[in-house]
């Protein structure tokens, strides 16, 4: 089961993988402290920095230290972030940290931010998009936003279409009320494969569907479904695609998974 997020094992095994010519930027997530947003004179701070300082400063999500209010989190973009090689991942991490360091230094020059400090940051740059498998079925954006329930659906996804196009604009399309996307087992199986599955960001899907499928909860659901399919296939001596879908769903349900409508 390839859970690399980059379809690395699928590629090494000789299965076809797909990638966009231009991929979405990555993000380095961090938290700031040492200032009070409500006391800042925003007229003296360039507008482009307001988002970083304001991020998630809602009354019900404030986190209080003994001295200052911490921003729950914010992020900087890392264009071209790539985690498919050690070299690329290192470059993305270094670029993210350099961008963040320059930002912190700049923010500290503004009135009210003299004591601003970096509280913490993620250990690595988060990568949104690399390779996807060419699976038995490629989920598309309409499948996702319509909440189509596939006959071989094994898990759900909830996130909106969320394509970070160039680091400056985001295309989003939220699911309508009572619509929940489902993920078919076929999208976890590479074409021409026998005893192989994937789970996570490298699921077989078009770019827009993948922009929603890539998040953690969806990946966890795919991982559990792929594991169950693999166990049943191994016990029965057949390929994952040949396992009865109701057996997969029953075992998932036994272990507490939230599964799409029973066939």
What are these regions (language model features)?
Residues 4-263:
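Flavin (FAD/FMN)-binding glycine-rich loop and adjacent Rossmann-like elements that form
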């Amino acid at each position: 089961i390839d859970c690399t997020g980059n379809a690395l094992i699928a590629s090494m095994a000789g299965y076809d993988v797909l990638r966009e010519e231009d991929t979405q930027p990555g993000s380095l997530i961090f938290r700031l402290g040492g200032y009070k947003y409500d006391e800042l004179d925003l007229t003296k701070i360039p507008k482009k920095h307001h988002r970083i300082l304001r991020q998630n400063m809602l009354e019900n999500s404030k986190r209080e230290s003994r001295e200052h209010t911490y921003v729950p989190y914010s992020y900087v973009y890392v264009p071209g972030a790539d985690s498919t090689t050690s070299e690329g991942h290192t470059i993305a991490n270094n670029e993210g940290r350099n961008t963040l360091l320059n930002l912190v230094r700049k923010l500290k020059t503004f009135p009210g931010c003299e004591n601003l400090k970096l509280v913490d940051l993620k250990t690595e740059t988060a990568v949104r998009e690399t390779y996807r498998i060419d699976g038995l079925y490629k989920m598309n954006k309409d499948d996702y936003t319509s909440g189509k329930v596939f006959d071989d659906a094994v898990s759900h996804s909830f996130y909106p279409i969320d394509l970070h196009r160039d680091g400056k604009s985001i295309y989003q399309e939220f699911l309508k009320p009572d619509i929940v996307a489902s993920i078919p087992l076929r999208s976890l199986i590479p074409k021409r494969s026998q005893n192989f599955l994937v789970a996570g960001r490298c699921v077989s899907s078009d770019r827009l569907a993948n922009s929603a499928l890539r998040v953690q909860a969806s990946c966890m659901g795919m991982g559990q479904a792929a594991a169950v399919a693999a166990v049943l296939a191994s016990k029965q001596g057949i390929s994952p695609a040949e396992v009865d879908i109701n057996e997969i769903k029953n075992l998932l349900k036994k272990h507490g998974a939230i599964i799409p409508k029973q066939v």
